[in-house]
């Protein structure tokens, strides 16, 4: 019990010492305290700068879009859902893809469950043909009158049924022998229009020599398709292949582009799958994408195989494949752009008198009307006000920062899928290496760009704080003293009107100079050094102990007189 009383006495003595030894300015009507500070929040956001990987700021904006909507929006881009059909099947006229004839699109969406349902085929230059058709954005077809003399046209197969009847690709004409003859074919078709024409043709590879002669008479056929600048000659490869839809033979699909003024020449003595007309080659920004995301009624400029994503951020890590005006793909999951100042959470109020501190010690929480401001303590009490001019100066330079980053990184283009056949494996490896290198480079550039912008933001906001402090110092001059923590001790009576004049820049130091000079000398003369404070502390403690002992002794004597306490002295 006595130990507790002693500790209480020591604490009270120390408090008395501080109260009388520090000479707090706001207890004196002749002085005031003015502190400058900046906005702070309890929990800031960590960002990276050039000099620091982890620096806390009051506010930051995420620059990386890391999730999609999970659905493909059909506006503003025209989306064509391929459903069960691939683009090439729709191009050739597979019976189950008739609904796509003459369709147009901005983006053709191929599904993983798409399948062919006609005679088995392959396209040696599949990726190029797919890309040309996809970028054209249409399957509009123009029939032409080719003259095929001495052969049977419109061949069909049980592998390609329309209803219950055997059929074939609607855009191709399977030519076989007529009677027991298959004459040499030599057909020309000039391009008298002012646009490029895409012709699709093919070569049939029978599974046996018997099938070859039954269809084309000759033991080996040949197909040559030429223009003035190109020529393709294909000799059928006769042989058994894995059975597909009841067929062991195959059709190889080829394509030729005929320029305006050029001529298409077709020579064959067998195995020709002839064109029925042409597709008009268009140049545009249409494309194709493999995705199983559902198509929905919504608006989005950017589409990925995962679904549409917003394009209000400069970067995304949802998918490398994109269509439309999309953020740049980077490897990082997050890149935060500082849109606020350095955050220094406000410390707990120290001391029973609630001392205030300036920006050098900490920030101020709860200052919602500005980034920079003033706090004061004077004879009229305490107050706080934001400095809107310095706040606006910082905001003007920061507000456009996000838009500038987007402008530097967004490109209005789409990244198409790259496909290569097995024989182009080395090209595919090289392409993958180039794409990976580009992504690595962009990821590094993005991180560097954001770090530079963050460094600039923090330096800028620190600079505005220092400018405001120096502006205040120049106003007060010798009428106040820099306390070293972002505060000024004003050596004259500075009421609220005086404080306001300092904030708005109309303070006249000459008016208060004499009073401030006089008060400075008086206050300095009685300021106690730390050594005197120690002596006062010990003297106060000793007196307190003495008084406590006197009170305790008096209580004991009183109790003994009343008989409440009995003392037995034993020898």
Curated annotation (Swiss-Prot):
Disulfide feature: 35-487, 73-298, 85-97, 118-160, 302-326, 494-498
SUPFAM superfamilies, per this entry? Answer: Influenza hemagglutinin (stalk) (SSF58064), Viral protein domain (SSF49818)
The segments annotated as topological domain Extracellular are 22-535
- Biological process GO terms, please? clathrin-dependent endocytosis of virus by host cell; fusion of virus membrane with host endosome membrane; fusion of virus membrane with host plasma membrane; viral budding from plasma membrane; virion attachment to host cell
Top-level division of the source organism's lineage: Viruses
Which cellular component, as a GO term, is one annotated location?
host cell plasma membrane
Q: Where is the lipid attached (S-palmitoyl cysteine)?
A: 560, 567, 570
Q: Which parts of the sequence are marked as the site Cleavage?
A: 350-351
Please provide the record's keywords in A-Z order: Clathrin- and caveolin-independent endocytosis of virus by host, Clathrin-mediated endocytosis of virus by host, Disulfide bond, Fusion of virus membrane with host endosomal membrane, Fusion of virus membrane with host membrane, Glycoprotein, Hemagglutinin, Host cell membrane, Host membrane, Host-virus interaction, Lipoprotein, Membrane, Palmitate, Signal, Transmembrane, Transmembrane helix, Viral attachment to host cell, Viral envelope protein, Viral penetration into host cytoplasm, Virion, Virus endocytosis by host, Virus entry into host cell
Q: How is it modified after translation?
A: Palmitoylated. In natural infection, inactive HA is matured into HA1 and HA2 outside the cell by one or more trypsin-like, arginine-specific endoprotease secreted by the bronchial epithelial cells. One identified protease that may be involved in this process is secreted in lungs by club cells.
Question: What membrane topology does the UniProt entry give?
Answer: Single-pass type I membrane protein
Sequence intervals crossing the membrane: 536-556
Glycan attachment sites: 29, 43, 59, 84, 186, 306, 504
Where, in residue ranges, is this chain on the Cytoplasmic side? 557-571
Per UniProt, subcellular location reads as:
Virion membrane; Host apical cell membrane
Return one GO MF term: host cell surface receptor binding
Secretion signal: which residues? 1-21
Q: What does this protein do?
A: Binds to sialic acid-containing receptors on the cell surface, bringing about the attachment of the virus particle to the cell. This attachment induces virion internalization either through clathrin-dependent endocytosis or through clathrin- and caveolin-independent pathway. Plays a major role in the determination of host range restriction and virulence. Class I viral fusion protein. Responsible for penetration of the virus into the cell cytoplasm by mediating the fusion of the membrane of the endocytosed virus particle with the endosomal membrane.
Assembly with partners or alone: Homotrimer of disulfide-linked HA1-HA2.
Q: Which family does the entry's similarity section mention?
A: Belongs to the influenza viruses hemagglutinin family.
**Other information:** Major glycoprotein, comprises over 80% of the envelope proteins present in virus particle.
The protein here is known as Hemagglutinin
Question: What is the species listed in this Swiss-Prot or TrEMBL entry?
Answer: Influenza A virus (strain A/Equine/Jillin/1/1989 H3N8)
In the UniProt record, what gene is named as encoding this protein? HA
């Amino acid at each position: 019990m006595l130990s507790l009383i002693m500790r209480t006495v020591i604490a009270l003595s120390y408090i008395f010492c501080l109260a009388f030894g520090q000479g707090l300015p706001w207890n004196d009507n002749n002085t005031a305290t003015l502190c400058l500070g900046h906005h702070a929040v309890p929990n800031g956001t960590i960002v990276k700068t050039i000099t620091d990987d982890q620096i806390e700021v009051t506010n930051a904006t995420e620059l990386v879009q890391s999730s999609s909507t999970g659905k493909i929006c059909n506006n503003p881009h025209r989306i064509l859902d391929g459903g069960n059909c691939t683009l090439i099947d729709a191009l050739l006229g597979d019976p189950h893809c008739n609904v796509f004839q003459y369709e147009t699109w901005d983006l053709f969406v191929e599904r993983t469950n798409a399948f062919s349902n006609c005679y088995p085929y392959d396209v040696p230059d599949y990726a190029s043909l797919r890309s040309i058709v996809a970028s054209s954005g249409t399957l509009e077809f123009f029939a032409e009158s080719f003259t095929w003399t001495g052969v049977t046209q419109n061949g069909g197969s049980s592998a390609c049924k329309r209803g219950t009847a055997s059929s074939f690709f609607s855009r191709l004409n399977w030519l076989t022998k007529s009677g027991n003859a298959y004459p040499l074919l030599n057909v020309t078709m000039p391009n008298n229009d002012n646009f490029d024409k895409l012709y699709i043709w093919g070569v049939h590879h029978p599974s046996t020599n018997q099938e070859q002669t039954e269809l084309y008479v000759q033991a080996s056929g040949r197909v040559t398709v030429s223009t003035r600048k190109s020529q393709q000659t294909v000799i059928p490869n006769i042989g058994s292949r894995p059975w597909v839809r009841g067929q062991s033979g195959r059709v190889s699909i080829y394509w030729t582009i005929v320029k305006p003024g050029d001529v298409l020449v077709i020579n064959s003595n067998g195995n020709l799958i002839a064109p029925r007309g042409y597709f008009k080659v268009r140049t545009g920004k249409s494309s194709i994408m493999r995705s199983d995301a559902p198509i929905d009624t919504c608006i989005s400029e950017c589409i990925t195989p995962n679904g549409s994503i917003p394009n209000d951020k400069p970067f995304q890590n949802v998918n490398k494949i994109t269509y439309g005006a999309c953020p740049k793909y980077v490897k990082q999951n997050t890149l935060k752009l500082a849109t606020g100042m350095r955050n220094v959470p406000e410390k707990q109020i120290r001391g029973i008198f609630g001392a205030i501190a300036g920006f050098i010690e900490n920030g101020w929480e709860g200052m919602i009307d500005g980034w920079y401001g003033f706090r004061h303590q004077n004879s009229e009490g305490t107050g706080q006000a934001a400095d809107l001019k310095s706040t606006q100066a910082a905001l003007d330079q920061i507000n456009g920062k996000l838009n500038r980053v987007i402008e530097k990184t967004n490109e209005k283009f789409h990244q198409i899928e790259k496909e290569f056949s097995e024989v182009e494996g080395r090209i595919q490896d090289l392409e993958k290496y180039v794409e990976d290198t580009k992504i690595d480079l962009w990821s590094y550039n993005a991180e560097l760009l954001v770090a530079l912008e963050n460094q600039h933001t923090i330096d800028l906001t620190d600079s505005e704080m220092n400018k405001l402090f120096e502006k205040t110092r120049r106003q007060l001059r010798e009428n106040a003293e820099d306390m070293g923590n972002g505060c000024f001790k004003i050596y004259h009576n500075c009421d609220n009107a005086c404080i306001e004049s300092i904030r708005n820049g109309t303070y006249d130091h000459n008016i208060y100079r004499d009073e401030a000079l006089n008060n400075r000398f008086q206050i300095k003369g009685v300021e106690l050094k730390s050594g005197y404070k120690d002596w006062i502390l010990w003297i106060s403690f000793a007196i307190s102990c003495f008084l406590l002992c006197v009170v305790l002794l008096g209580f004991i004597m009183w109790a003994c007189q009343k008989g409440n306490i009995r003392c037995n002295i034993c020898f």
